[in-house]
């Protein structure tokens, strides 16, 4: 519970900081100018003001759990794939191997990443429905084949699977198959689907 509360508070603080930096960076001569194009800052500001949902984020915290000191943040990554498969799936398999197969009961995996991703897809779909008056008919999950390790494809495939489990129609597409429909100003996949 402490780690979840701390993470929620840190996430809210990060959003507040992003709003502050976005506002300040638009002021002439501001020392907080990050060199981000004005249009991108304005889009981010609208998104922050609307409280658009994000899919997931990851904190790197330092916390011993037994010295009375609160958790402290080392790093924050939002909507980036690093470590997602390991945290959501491999930790579950470790839990099964160490506890369940040994007959230990009453202990659950301490994170609920997989379940929360599925729930968050539902919230995102609802948000897009309210925002645009309709829900997307298909979610496209794009990956690059330039990643020799396969991590990008594995992570993208996993995220797509969680969206499917949330009841969303989804497809996997290579980045190089993405195009732009100039008439509708919408992105398309290799099959010319929006």
Can you name each region flagged by the protein language model?
Residues 8, 12-15, 19-26, 46, ...:
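Generic surface-pattern signal
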Residues 46-80:
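Conserved metal-phosphate-binding beta-hairpin within the catalytic cores
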Residues 62-68, 80-194:
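Domain-scale recognition of functional cores that engage charged ligands
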Residues 1-43, 138:
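Low-complexity, highly charged intrinsically disordered N-terminal segments
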Residues 1-5, 75, 99-104:
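Charged, low-complexity surface segments at secondary-structure and domain boundaries
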Residues 43-47, 145:
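Short secondary-structure boundary micro-motifs
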């Amino acid at each position: 519970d402490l780690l979840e509360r701390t993470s929620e508070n840190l996430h809210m603080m990060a959003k507040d900081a992003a709003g502050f930096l976005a506002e300040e960076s638009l002021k002439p001569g501001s020392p907080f100018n990050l060199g981000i194009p004005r249009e991108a800052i304005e889009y981010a500001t609208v998104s922050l003001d609307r409280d658009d949902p994000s899919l997931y984020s990851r904190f790197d915290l330092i916390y011993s759990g037994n010295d009375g000191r609160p958790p402290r943040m080392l790093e924050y990554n939002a909507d980036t794939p690093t470590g997602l498969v390991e945290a959501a799936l491999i930790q579950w398999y470790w839990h099964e191997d160490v506890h369940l197969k040994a007959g230990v009961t009453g202990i659950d995996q301490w994170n609920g990443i997989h379940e929360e991703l599925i729930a968050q897809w539902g919230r995102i779909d609802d948000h897009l429905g309210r925002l645009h008056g309709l829900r997307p008919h298909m979610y496209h999950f794009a990956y690059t084949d330039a990643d020799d390790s396969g991590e990008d494809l594995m992570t993208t495939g996993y995220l797509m699977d969680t969206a499917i489990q949330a009841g969303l129609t989804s497809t996997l597409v290579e980045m190089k198959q993405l195009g732009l429909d100039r008439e509708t100003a919408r992105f398309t996949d290799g099959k010319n689907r929006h």
